[in-house]
Swiss-Prot record:
Residue runs in coiled coils: none
Its membrane topology: Multi-pass membrane protein
GO cellular component, one term: plasma membrane
Consequence of gene loss (knockout): Disruption of the gene causes a 10-fold reduction in the efficiency of sporulation. Mutants divide asymmetrically but fail to complete engulfment of the forespore by the mother cell.
Any single biological process term in GO: manganese ion export across plasma membrane
Organism for this UniProt entry: Bacillus subtilis (strain 168)
Cysteines paired by S-S bonds: none
GO molecular function: manganese ion transmembrane transporter activity
Name of this chain's protein: Probable sporulation protein YtaF
Length: 210
């Protein structure tokens, strides 16, 4: 049963990768296999680090407290994602090149947050291909929302290694699928209607563990 929770959580925190890949595919941009591996490694590394932090926190609280806390963290993150989806339309950005993945203003994170808000900005050299440092920045940008979920997952007792591998595989898979889908589909508005799924999955997993 825990493996089901791990797969669902990995799915929830990796769906943004599909959205970004889809956006790039529509613009006929390319992400080489090596760059996809870099993105996967970044996603897995961020998840692993966040879960180590979560595991460290479990040493200071009783088991029954950590179980509730982990569930509440996932519910909270999921609720935030749903808020971003359902908030008034006037506050949203609908331009393709400014497809918003996370409405969060943290100036200290600079370019990472900028990439989250405008995925096309990850192509720093405007070459139409995501490579090198661009892949690293994109990988970390896609992992920001997974950081809190990783802490919650560790508190719930999930394996950091298994969870990190699952997220790495899911994120690379969804980026690849998104790019291919974007190449073949000219209409993309339907994908916006699915943006609530990560939040719903996180809330479901969190409530399941409460």
């Amino acid at each position: 049963m825990q493996m089901v929770s791990i797969l669902l959580l990995a799915l929830a925190v990796s769906l943004d990768s599909f959205s970004v890949g889809f956006t790039y595919g529509l613009r006929k941009m390319k992400i080489p296999f090596k760059a996809i591996l870099v993105i996967a490694c970044c996603s897995g590394a961020v998840m692993f680090i966040s879960m180590l932090i979560g595991s460290f926190l479990t040493k200071f609280f009783p088991v029954y407290v950590t179980e509730k806390l982990g569930g509440l963290i996932l519910v909270g993150i999921g609720a935030w994602v749903l808020y971003q989806f359902f908030k008034p339309a006037k506050d949203k950005e609908y331009l393709l090149h400014e497809k918003t993945l996370l409405n969060l203003e943290v100036r200290s994170l600079g370019i990472v947050i900028h990439i989250l808000r405008k995925p096309m900005s990850a192509d720093i050299d405007k070459s139409g291909v995501i490579n090198g440092i661009e892949a690293v920045l994109l990988g970390f940008a896609l992992s920001i929302d997974a950081f809190g979920a990783g802490i919650g997952a560790a508190i719930l007792g999930f394996s950091p290694i298994v969870m990190s591998i699952a997220v790495a595989i899911m994120s690379s898979l969804f980026v690849s699928i998104g790019i291919n889908a974007g190449h073949f589909l000219s209409k993309w508005k339907w994908i916006d209607k699915m943006a609530f799924l990560p939040g719903l999955l996180l809330i479901t997993i969190g409530l399941w563990k409460l």
